[in-house]
């Protein structure tokens, strides 16, 4: 197994989750973050520099709060009867392995082919199996034909779906984007969508499309989880909001 290009940023977030897992009172437990770190090191990947590590530590409270919020979102979606989940740009978070999924759930993970290959090979070599009933990796470039590849992988466009868009701020910074057009097109009534976004543009657009939307700011979220930290965290989440939407029609 080789380490794919672009994996360093995903490893940086994995380092933040690994750190939170060892906190005195962690928001979540992610034993798989260390699996990815070890797999990357064993294949000659350089971990982030000291300067980058300092920046990671500086946004640790924000990153941990974000992870917790998306974890709770998926658990709530399952409790409300949704059995089809999609994570867009899943990165190296092993939610398919670490969350307590409802029996019968199918989880699709969309990401670049190299990232998914690295992720699944690392976990397989470590002897890990998904906790979700059906896990389906979908290798795709988000700029080209991802929704077609998702359908080809078995995605049911008639079934209400819980979507998550996390860590894609450059793509969703200015409101409606082709990504959300496509999600809207293949999401029937009863579907849910969780988005980490900059500003309220995404929330405003979803509201016009018939989604019921709630929004919480990053600072409020960190306070809720007892992770309201230093100035770096404050700067990181200054304009970030977390959007939770349900499609009624």
From Swiss-Prot:
Protein name according to UniProt: Putative S-adenosyl-L-methionine-dependent methyltransferase Mjls_0570
Q: Name one Pfam family in it.
A: LCM
Q: Which GO terms describe its biological process?
A: methylation
Organism expressing this protein natively: Mycobacterium sp. (strain JLS)
Q: Which residues bind S-adenosyl-L-methionine?
A: 111, 141-142
Gene3D superfamilies in the cross-refs:
Vaccinia Virus protein VP39
EC number(s) on record?
2.1.1.-
Under SUPFAM superfamilies, the record lists: S-adenosyl-L-methionine-dependent methyltransferases (SSF53335)
According to the record, the segments passing through the membrane are none
Q: Does the keyword S-adenosyl-L-methionine apply?
A: yes
Q: Which InterPro entries match?
A: Ppm1/Ppm2/Tcmp (IPR007213), SAM-dependent_MTases_sf (IPR029063), SAM_mthyl_Trfase_ML2640-like (IPR011610)
Q: What class of enzyme is it?
A: transferase
GO MF terms here are:
methyltransferase activity
Q: Does the keyword S-adenosyl-L-methionine apply?
A: yes
Q: Which PANTHER family match?
A: S-ADENOSYL-L-METHIONINE-DEPENDENT METHYLTRANSFERASE YKTD-RELATED (PTHR43619), S-ADENOSYL-L-METHIONINE-DEPENDENT METHYLTRANSFERASES SUPERFAMILY PROTEIN (PTHR43619:SF2)
Instruction: Tell me the classification of the organism that encodes this protein.
Output: Bacteria, Bacillati, Actinomycetota, Actinomycetes, Mycobacteriales
The record's family statement is: Belongs to the UPF0677 family.
